[in-house]
Amino acid sequence: MLEPRPRVFFLFVSCLDDLIGTDHEALLSALGARHPEIAFRMCHMNPISLGSRTPPPVSIQNNLYSLLAPSEKRDEGINAIGNLEPTAVTSELYHFLSAYGVSRLRHISQYETLNAYQEMAGSRANLVIGAPGRQAAGQMEERLGIPWIFMPVTYDMEEIEDNYRRLKAFLFPDREEACDWGPARERALQAIRRAVKKAGRFPIIIDASAASQPFGMAKALLTYGFSVVRVEAQDCMAFDKPHMEWLREHHPEVELHQPEHHRAVLFDRRMENSLAIGVEGAYLAGSRHVADLFNDSGMFGFDGVCRLMRLIEEAAEQETDLGQLINGYGLVV
């Protein structure tokens, strides 16, 4: 018997359980009846469901936020949903929220107990930064009455400004403008100029493990003066499709590949002199220079542009031990 007693118990099952028809609802019902003090949740680590409405990343988000109970209290806090890591404290997003009186941008990683976690149920709105959190946010709106807005990470300066206008209209429609984006925008422009000067000579490869909008990142970097030559993405999310179409129209020379295509194992697309953003594209190309970014970690707004530029500069300055990087991620290749 576990001591102290857990409040929540997540059961992870593989595709085998789904294929043999395991009755998970019956299992959850039996466990709940035997241990009513514990909330049981079933998570499916099933690659077969990747093309379904609830692939594993979405299912996990749904289960996590289903633990929040309706709250009688409502404060000015905002929840960040879907992003695996909290937005970096250097982001101007905090300055934006603070200018309108919001002192807390809550993220699930900030909580150590279930009781403390319930604080998120009292927030006034959900900012969905990671796409897998959209379904959970919709469920939270139905159960908890928390409205939400989807704003995936972008590295395009114009899109960033537009996102902040959308966010202001969503959160504070009746308030006067309280933020000056000039300084944050100028910092991003300076970071871009430095990075282009240092890394502009490298052919750049972008993959979907690094960013939720790899085609959008490619568009932004090409606009800034970088030499993007390849995008590796198994699928293109609907919100990233306009960027992919832009690439096809304006830069048809950029290669678009699927990393899980059966020909990928031939390794006939090696480009060792490239600078890869993301470990998947780096592995397939054998890149000697790698900007180690995973899932837009901590990125948002103009600060996200600055941080991406620093990663590119650092990658240009030194070669990467690709084997060590892959082992560090615990990837199976």
Q: PLM features: what roles do these ranges have?
A:
Residues 1-333:
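An N-terminal assembly and electron-transfer interface module characteristic of large anaerobic redox
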